[in-house]
Amino acid sequence: MMKGVKIEILLLLSVFFLACGNRNEENSGKDLTVMFATTTGLVGDGYNEPILKALMESVSAQPGITVHLLKPDNLSEARSQFNDWLAGADERKALILCGPEFEPLVDGVNLKTGRIMLLDSDKTYGGGISTALLKRYGGAWLAGAIMKDFELVLLKGLDGDRIIDEISQGIEDGYSDNGGAGFQKCVLSTGYEGLNMADELYSILWEQEVVKLFYSYEGLIVPVCGSSRLGAFNFSWRYYATIGIGDDCSPYTDILPFSLVLDLGGIVREYVSEWVQNSSWPAHADYGMSTGHVYISFNGRFFQNFASNNESWPFSLDAWTALENQYKDKALEKEAGYAY
């Protein structure tokens, strides 16, 4: 299955570069640079990959744009690439920085020409720099609430990352606030390698007592761990059932009742569209459940092909949907009240 996902990415890249080469007079000269997060990969991570896909879709619909994709290994390399972009900035150039780790790059910058968008920042800079914040807590709380009748094993990539902490805390709070009583948490690492250890995670799931949950259909794996989640999806093909976090994860495994979609790609798509149309970007904008950028996506194949044929599986799609509707308004309140 992982091989198929990689092939999909390669096909999308082919379309992407063909689109970039198809010049048209209206967009000729427009130059877009996207710097991806350093802490995880481009494939399978739930952060960079959805942004990459949205970018390719946007550019293929707007031929004539020159696009540069940057994936620095660390913040020092990112700063060097950022300074190079600043040195050549002009009115037809835009830069999208994918992640709050890049906040130090724009501190103190007063952009004279061109434009910059910093994703996942709650700061307001002005001076030609826009920020956008995706609020994840409410959607994570909702996901935890609708899983209240299961035992959960939450696989957390690391402690101390703002986004990982927000998602994990939201799931745990939604679960416990609504009577869930079987919560386990496993922190994979003390550093960002916890977001890039799919093989090790598979071994952890196999070796630990967690595997016993799945013989009785009482447990759900919840991977909040970047591309390490691929190990959980691989495990779920052989045992039982995983929740998707980040994007629609149903292409990875059918044994997945739902995904918590955090639509970073949709945000990037909107900003690219506004830039192409020469519309201004706001100094700051918030996104989340309230804007339709965070939502539950149920996996129809799971309920049609698996749950309906397993009498031990306790919940129908209608039952899950009813729980979502029951807790959605409260989740929106949680989104609005969380200290981001």
Where are these regions (language model features)?
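C-terminal motif of bacterial Sec signal peptides marking the signal peptidase cleavage site
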Residues: 18-19
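Extracytoplasmic "Venus flytrap"
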Residues: 33-54, 58, 68-75, 100
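Periplasmic-binding protein-like
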Residues: 36-37, 91-100, 119, 154, ...
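An alpha-beta-alpha
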Residues: 55, 139-188, 283-310
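Short, well-structured alpha-helical segments in soluble
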Residues: 76-93, 197-217
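Flexible loop/hinge segments that line or gate small-molecule binding clefts
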Residues: 107-134, 248-254
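Short beta-strand elements at the ligand-binding edges of bilobed clamshell
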Residues: 124-148, 156-159, 253-265
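Hinge/cleft segment of the Venus flytrap/periplasmic-binding protein
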Residues: 270-340
